[in-house]
Amino acid sequence: MNYRRLGRTGFEVSEIGYGAWGIGGAQWQGGTDEESMRAVHRAIELGLNFIDTALAYGDGHSERLVGKIVREAGRRIYVATKVPPKNQLWPARRGIGIDQVFPYDYVIESTETSLKNLGMETVDLQQLHVWNPEWIGRDEWKRALEDLKKSGKARFVGVSINDHQPDSALELIRTGLIDTVQVIYNVFDQSPERNLFPLTEQFNIGVIARVPLDEGALTGAITEETKFDERDFRDYYFRGDHKKQVVEHVNALRRDLGNVDGSLPEIALRFCLSEPAVSTVIPGMRRVRHAESNIATAEKGPLDEKTMAVLRRHAWEKNFYGEP
């Protein structure tokens, strides 16, 4: 496993981290706690040392599993979690004030609940789970994040940027008040490269790249006949003609890649890791074989320029999550 610095936190984190939304259950069906825990422990054996969870993942279930895993790990594991929006709206909506989303007392209380779930006195990284640039001039969130650090409840703080809106955090980064950003970055959504990544490098901000496989679209396993449990988030994500669109784009991508070595998910992960601004990439890995293959992929290093040029042509502007 290779390691990169998570910006000014100074944490040396594994290039492949663990995205723990799936192990919360609820919106991700088809797995078990036992299977998920085996996968995380295997990833840790192979060098993974960064796990990203959230209070909203299974109403704390993901955090409780992560806490148990960390206690059993026998080595230093960096843990990041998130404060959910109080109004339960993802992504953050324009025109809704921060007093309805992240009031001061709520941020503190949510963090304390997360710490209880995790079985920790301090979390390495606490993040706001959504962000709205209209809040930049308000004091509540600034005071809450500063007090989390002063009180020792969180070592560092960051923000998870709204889906497909990387530029919404540019002014936030310039305030100097956050240490990390989490952003969607993959072959289809390359938009953070334009403005966000240059700024994170300038301000020494850690970058957590989420959704590297586009919720499964870039695994190449989605067909027009693919079915998901109606309780599964992916049933919504791949609704309507979305599966048809994915199949068309993935087929075009495969044609262009030709004989490039590696499977589609391997190439997709290496695409993310070829960006020097990225500190860690956090795929979900609920099965041991996925943990092993993803970590083995990281060992192969960045893609060559010819392959990157091919992938650059496949940026795709879409929003399957729904309009904010």
Stretches found by the model and what they are:
Residues 21-34, 93-106, 134:
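Active-site mouth loops of central-metabolism enzymes
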Residues 8-10, 67-78, 115-119, 149, ...:
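Acidic (Asp/Glu)-rich catalytic clusters
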